[in-house]
Each structure stands twice: as structure tokens, then as C-alpha cells.
Amino acid sequence: LDMPIEKFDKVMSNNIKSNQILCNLVLPDMVERNDGSIIIISSIGGLKGSNILGAYNISKAADIMMVKNIAAEFGKNNIRANSIAPGLIKTDFAKALWENPDILKAVLGNTPMQRIGEPDEIAGVAVMLASKAGEYINGQTIVIDGGTTIV
């Protein structure tokens, strides 16, 4: 947390405020339809502390709590809210991590599946949560990390 408050505010704005704004835009229509599914992409960072990514992890923990609160408040309107907490996924966002051999080796050493995730592995869970198969899943965080958080 040793960072200027302006940087902390930017992380919170990018990761929390933006989700709040988007949810407030879609929730009235979902309430009117008495149906809907909100899926927020969080991170395994939201499940643990960090001596490097403190503000990011705090914002991702807030994503997880936002989902729980939306689920509690709007469940009566048949609106579900869930989050997905990915580990290291082969995306442009995380490219600096998976392209760095030392970081990649450290991540793989702590991942039972010995690989990083692929974007379609996140997309598949998002599709399930938004589909009929996910109609009774509400307020949950689904971790997709190859087992990193279990060891």
C-alpha cells in the first residue's frame, strides 16, 4: 500500500467504480425483466494478501464482495451475480508475467497443473454462469487457476 493516494484511487476506479457504474446501468432492466446474470472478472489476488500488489488485490477482493451484495440484494428479482477469479492466464494483460521466464517458472512451480490458463477456459465458465446451467449459482466466486490457490 506504499503508493501515492492518486495511484490507489486509479486502481479502485478502474477495478471497482467501473463495475459499480456498469452494474447500475444494467440492473434496472434486469429488475424489470425479473431475470439477469452479472459476471465480474476478479482475480485470485482478491483471495489473498500481497506485499507487491496490495491495491490491486484489495480492488479484486472488493469485486468479490460486490458480487455477494448484488446477489443478496437482487436475488429476489431472479438476478444472479457471480465472479470468476482467474490465476495467470495467457492474455495480453498478463503478458509481462508469462513472457518472463523467471516469473513463469515460479508460477508453474506453485501450480499443480504445471501450466498457465487459456482465455477460453475463462470464457467457458462465463458462458456456463450466464446460461440455464448456471441459473442456481448466485453470489459465488469460481476460481480458475490450475490449483494454485490450493497449495
Regions found by a protein language model. Give the residues of each.
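Active-site loop immediately N-terminal to the catalytic Tyr-X3-Lys motif
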Residues: 1, 48-54, 76-77, 114, ...
